Amino acid sequence: MDYVYLDYAASAPMRKEALDAEKTYEASPIAGVNPNSLHSLGRQAARELDGARGVIARAVGGKFRAPDVVFCSGGTEGNNLSVLGMAEGIRNKDHKRNTVVFSAIEHDSILDLAPVLREKGFEVRIAHPNRQGKIEASALEGLLDQSVALVSVMYANNETGVIQPVVDLAHTAHKVGALFHTDAVQAFGRIPLEVEDVDALTIAAHKIGGPLGIGAVLMRSKVPFKAQSYGGGQEAGRRHGTQDVRSALAFAAAAAWCLENLTQTQESVSARANKVYETLCASPKIRPTTEAYAGKDHMPGTVSIMVPSMDSETLILKLDQAGFEVSAGSACSSGSLDASHVLSAMGISRNEALGSLRITFDERVSEADLDTFCATLLQIVG
């Protein structure tokens, strides 16, 4: 059976450009060479690694520079590194700053840091979204005071696709002297990022057609930071361990492709997603999780729906048998199909949330395949 893969928000298939970059590296004299070595090949590998940093910094924009790019293993490590390292770094500089603010719709790699931070003596406050899944600046303001060290709100939600007002949120955090981090894993490479006022952000290669196992934190040089690992002093002392040059080059190749083709792909994928929404939600048995899908504040290629009369697991298995690969939400927590914490935070009932589906794709999924998917799901729902 030929499968139609519709789980790009979990991980996107590798792009040809990224695969070609890996092949070029493997055939080069620096294949397997440690970029921290002082000999000629080591220095050459280091130059290639720094070149990849520059490409990624340009793709992100926001006046980030190559030295701001800290390579890591992916989004989860990047979020851990950013939040823990920045919170402790800020508090070491100003002991009054012992509060961290998250939103209730963050990825588990952020939310699961709450007990860790509390053990370290921080207070953790949670900002809640409105019914459409957006964190408004007004919801943040009531949580902020001079004790806040760091605010972390994701750029775009990994389940609903709702884009957050990051510019306003960063300004709000800065008014009380707090720094602002955003998890941009779902947004990077798919929409233009407005991050001039963001102090740090997290991205991951495998969401944009790069390899699994590599991501990056982009952090301004002025940001106070306490390293969360110890060893060889790599990544300017912010993340220790020998870097994976092969994956960094493939990451950069995917990022460069996304930057070059961003406008065209955003328009075409948005049009396809809107058609999927309109087709599916014409059924009285299917509802969108948020009305934001029709506007500019929604990720292209993310379709988030609910089928209250059925559970997600049944829907996923029936679609899988028909050759369509979708998910119920974040792949990092999909081993247990309980009601989504994101949808619950939006005020959606548990019964409705248990019937949620996430369909995600980019320009490589054809309109014909999406039409067939819609017809198949409508037949399953009845």
Give a label for each model feature.
Residues 1-382:
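Pyridoxal 5′-phosphate
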